[in-house]
Amino acid sequence: ETNSIVSVHVYDIKDRVTTPMNIGEETDIYIPRIKWTKDPKRLAIMKLNRFQNHLEILLANARVGSTTVLYREENKYYIDESNLDNLVFLDNGTQFVITSEKSGYMHLYLYDLNGRERQAITKGNFDIIDFYGYDPVRKLFYYSSYEESPLEKYIYSINEKGLKKKLTPVKGWNEASFSKNFNYYINVVSNTDTPPVTALYNAKGKQVRVLEDNKAVKEAVKAYNLAKPEFIQIPAADGKTMLNAWIMKPVNQKTGKKYPLLITQYSGPNSQQVKNNWSLSWLNYLAQEGYIVACIDPRGTAARGEEFRKCTYMQLGKL
């Protein structure tokens, strides 16, 4: 069956004219995202080959349809989809931010609209997870990452000189939502001991107020004396790679007694099941009923760099 041919068109609401954008002669492609720049006459068109290992971002003149290549990246495995969502054009109209794994880890990079890389905003042996945006007043980039542990997610701000500040002091898994002007953000944090706590913070990282602490949930669960996951590492089949895992044992486990073991896992590319967050499910019930429950994040899962994440490329089901 012949693949569909994709094209991009801009419709002028006032003049009622449709203009096709020039995306090149190659037809066996994807257009996974399109995005307006800060200039209403310029459109960014993302173009991927079928193997998804060659990305081009075209800068299109929305009035006449002409395009130039703004950004190009090739990867020996594939371009991770999260890079596409992390493209952000800055309000100054001359720069954009995108994530890339070209260093072996997912990091933020600043480019100008001539396609020149200005700097790596973040560096190190850890992956960026989310890019929340740029505050032009405070000149700060906001992001989340695994830089303290593959099991935990924290929120940070960083300036163009690399000065970084951690905005989430509570240990565990953090999710943030920023106000439009970055004056405030709502953070939701949990860990294996604490159900989600939702709080409002100001731009300096100071807590304004707790919106929901879930203390009632925490106290109610305490009465059941539920088993908690214990984080461990186990060797992979290659004998060298250590895999993150958790194990949950019956609270009243007796030494020397054998227990049935249930292993649960998802293992999809770039997925993650082993993390320090609140989770309450039938797995806790099984542990209460005399089962040992374990979960493993094997090779190909998230939080440990490109080589670990993409080693299953063309090898899915073998590693």
Task: Tell me the role of every PLM-derived stretch.
Residues 1-184, 190-196, 200-201:
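Beta-propeller folds
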